[in-house]
Design a protein with these regions (language model features):
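Active-site neighborhoods of divalent-metal-dependent phosphate/nucleic-acid chemistry enzymes
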Residues: 2, 76-118
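Acidic active-site catalytic centers that drive phospho-/nucleotidyl reactions
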Residues: 7-9, 48, 100, 119
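Generic alpha-helical structural context detector
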Residues: 13, 31, 51-54, 69, ...
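Acidic, PIN/NYN-like endoribonuclease modules and their adjacent C-terminal/linker elements
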Residues: 104, 109-140
């Protein structure tokens, strides 16, 4: 079964009124992965979303909490010590940030074939996970 991991920027753009095209694309991706039951996020993604939404997007914390509550149709993966160890290996092997490596580690553990992210190199494979930029058409 096809499984897709959604990086924090997908959730952030879904709430970003200053980026209407990216907002449209992010919302479409969230709807599709939730409807198909193949969307995966991690606690890291939810935590990063809350901080970014309330600080950068100036969304009221209660509103951000309500947005988080709408994510229940996505599988929520809790982080493990093994994820952290694999992320450290990923930093060394792939020369990516620890936080990006932690996303890749969680996606691999969830058996996702793709990570949707704007932050990593689109088209590149990290282990068994391929990165796709869902906003490529918005920035082209």
């Amino acid at each position: 079964m096809y499984r897709a991991f959604l990086d924090t920027n997908v959730l952030v753009y879904a709430s970003d009124r200053d980026e209407p095209e990216k907002r449209r694309l992010a919302r479409a991706l969230l709807r599709a992965t939730a409807a198909d039951g193949n969307g995966v996020i991690s606690t890291q993604v939810v935590q990063e979303f809350f901080v970014t939404a309330t600080r950068k997007l100036a969304i009221d914390p209660l509103r951000a909490k309500a947005i988080v509550a709408t994510l229940h149709r996505l599988e929520l993966l809790e982080g493990t010590l093994e994820d952290i160890n694999q992320a450290i290996d990923g930093v060394i092997l792939w020369q990516v940030s620890f936080w990006d490596a932690l996303i890749l580690s969680a996606a691999g553990r969830a058996r996702c074939s793709v990570v949707y992210s704007e932050d990593l190199n689109a088209g590149q494979r990290y282990g068994g996970v391929e990165v796709k930029n869902p906003f490529a058409e918005a920035t082209a």
